[in-house]
From Swiss-Prot:
This is 3-ketosteroid-9-alpha-monooxygenase, oxygenase component. It comes from Rhodococcus rhodochrous. Homotrimer. The two-component system 3-ketosteroid-9-alpha-monooxygenase is composed of an oxygenase component KshA and a reductase component KshB. Keywords: 2Fe-2S, Iron, Iron-sulfur, Lipid degradation, Lipid metabolism, Metal-binding, Oxidoreductase, Steroid metabolism. May be involved in the degradation of cholic acid, a steroid acid found predominantly in the bile. Coiled coil: none annotated. Its EC number is 1.14.15.30. CDD domains: Rieske_RO_Alpha_KSH. Its cofactor is [2Fe-2S] cluster; Fe cation. [2Fe-2S] cluster binds at C68, H70, C87, H90.
């Protein structure tokens, strides 16, 4: 049986579109800075090309295009010699400013021997690289804020995770407005949710309560009450989340980093890391163990996200209900990083606020949690009584 014309016209079709051909303008984190300070060159596939990353004699990290402008050798397979990176093909020595400094077998270096040097930022133990399709340097007002705990002995060192994801990086950006997925995908329970977009910053403020159906309190363990999360993207790919876990009688303060850089239009490297504030309850090794436990918990959450992304389709025209977040407004904000600077429109950067009315979601989710707990209790009762019935029958 075929549908009539009127019924056919009512069907909502998905507009998948295609990912932007260019990569986002902004600061992108490449990982822990210390990993690049071992005296060796490192290759990084990013922005549709290959980069070489190394630290000079002053421990200052340098980044160039990886392919030598002489004959195309891969500089990331070369050697660090003094402050320069030496090509493995003919030993041309390239400085951090992109200029060829020395050719051992040549009388002179050609004046035009220059490759692309990338702006870097080594801050709070993290390495950032600036990407701009127009080739402009980073503006003074587009910055990554300092993370006080990252350089303090009162906090742990970074616990860091890295994985590749085979999809366009817009998928992870959408999560900042998607309150409902925290309940259904991550088994969290948001009770307050607000977004603020302004300039190059997009923020999410969330409060959550513990879920006894999915993460029941274990006897002898601290009881979690809930969590407070104040998370902001500074630019297209780097999020700082001031995350507080609330337990009976005390809180645990942490900072979660959620960041990525594009490899190609359909692949990105996802990284996330955590530090935890030490306290009388969390000293020394115990604080680091807590950071690792929290980090492993966050890792499971990202694995849940990745499984969704792996199987979903790109959708440029999502069909939303009132209790969905401001997806279209977020995507307008995100678009500013994919157009030339002179084409950034006010609607991409003007302040926008949206606080979710959580009345309906919280009521529905509470019923679901209660039903899950009741179902589990009935199953436990049935399981415990089964052996007794078997013995009586015998």
């Amino acid at each position: 049986m075929s549908l009539g014309t009127s019924e056919q016209s009512e069907i909502r079709e998905i507009v998948a579109g295609s990912a932007p051909a260019r990569f986002a303008r902004g600061w992108h984190c490449l990982g822990l800075a210390k990993d690049f300070k071992d005296g060796k060159p490192h290759s990084v596939h990013a922005f549709g090309t290959k980069l070489v990353v190394w630290a000079d004699s002053n421990d200052e990290i340098r980044i160039l295009d990886a392919y030598c402008r002489h004959m195309g050798g891969d500089l990331s397979q070369g050697t660090v010699k003094g402050d320069e990176i030496a090509c493995p093909f003919h030993d041309w020595r390239w400085g951090g400013n992109g200029r060829c400094k020395n050719i051992p077998y040549a009388r002179r270096v050609p004046p035009i021997a220059k490759t692309r040097a990338w702006h870097t930022l080594d801050q709070d133990g993290l390495l950032f690289v600036w990407h701009d399709p127009q080739g402009n340097p980073p503006p003074a007002d587009v910055t990554i804020p300092r993370i006080a705990g990252a350089t303090s002995d009162e906090w742990t060192d970074w616990v860091w995770y890295t994985t590749e994801v085979d999809t366009n990086c817009r998928e992870i950006i959408d999560n900042i407005v998607d309150m409902a997925h925290f309940f259904y995908v991550h088994y969290s329970f948001p009770v307050y949710f607000k977004n603020v977009f302004e300039g190059h910053v997009a923020s999410q403020f969330m409060r959550g309560q513990a879920r006894e159906d999915t993460r029941p309190h274990a006897n002898g363990q601290p009881k979690m009450i809930g969590s407070r999360s104040d998370a902001s993207y500074f630019g297209p790919s780097f999020m700082i989340d001031d995350l507080v876990y609330e337990y009976e009688g005390y809180d645990v303060e942490s900072v979660l980093i959620n960041c990525h850089y594009p490899v190609s239009q359909d692949k990105f490297v996802l990284m996330y890391g955590m530090i935890v504030k030490k306290s009388d309850r969390l000293e020394g090794e115990k604080a680091l163990q807590t950071a690792q436990q929290f980090g492993n918990f966050i890792a499971k959450g990202f694995e849940q996200d990745i499984e969704i992304w792996r199987n979903k389709t790109r959708i440029d025209n999502p069909l939303l209900c009132e209790e969905d977040g401001p997806v279209y407004q977020l995507r307008r904000w995100y678009e500013q990083f994919y157009v030339d600077v002179e084409d950034v429109a006010p609607e991409m950067t003007d302040r926008f606020e949206f606080e979710m009315d959580t009345t309906r979601p919280v009521a529905a989710w509470m019923k679901e949690v209660e039903a899950n707990i009741a179902r589990k209790a009935a199953l436990d009762t049935e399981t415990r009584s089964a052996p007794e019935q078997s013995t009586t029958a015998g």
